[in-house]
């Protein structure tokens, strides 16, 4: 057990982006992950392709995950946020090459309507989606991402009006 923990800590973080996508009512897009039996809700996120800027990656990932890029960036996080995945998930994610993700987060105003959202994309990540209030967001998020989400909410909260 010690060796696997040590190995876990030696792994790097995967660079990525996260998107807090707001609708006109300032509710936040959350999707339920398709690859797990537990109720694992999260905001859209994804990796950064080499040579891609974080803002370009955020808009690309938005299109890939929710089927729409109708929106614009309101703000970018001031720092990189990171999280570790539980050690039992490491072999199942990213070929076991990363301990978690370090992410630049973006607050995005969605300018489309619900009909523009299509989670049945070529590589779907969600099997359900909904708009969540800021108050309920932290209670429905998968626990190992909660601390990161608290930090993102704290940074963007004053901009959500």
Curated annotation (Swiss-Prot):
InterPro entries: NUDIX_hydrolase-like_dom_sf, NUDIX_hydrolase_CS, NUDIX_hydrolase_dom, RppH. Its EC number is 3.6.1.-. It comes from the Bacteria. Pfam families: NUDIX. GO terms for molecular function: mRNA 5'-diphosphatase activity. It is an enzyme of class 3 (hydrolase). GO terms for cellular component: cytoplasm. A motif (Nudix box) lies at residues 46-67. Residues 12-154 form the Nudix hydrolase domain. Accelerates the degradation of transcripts by removing pyrophosphate from the 5'-end of triphosphorylated RNA, leading to a more labile monophosphorylated state that can stimulate subsequent ribonuclease cleavage. Belongs to the Nudix hydrolase family. RppH subfamily. This is RNA pyrophosphohydrolase. It comes from Rickettsia felis (strain ATCC VR-1525 / URRWXCal2) (Rickettsia azadi).
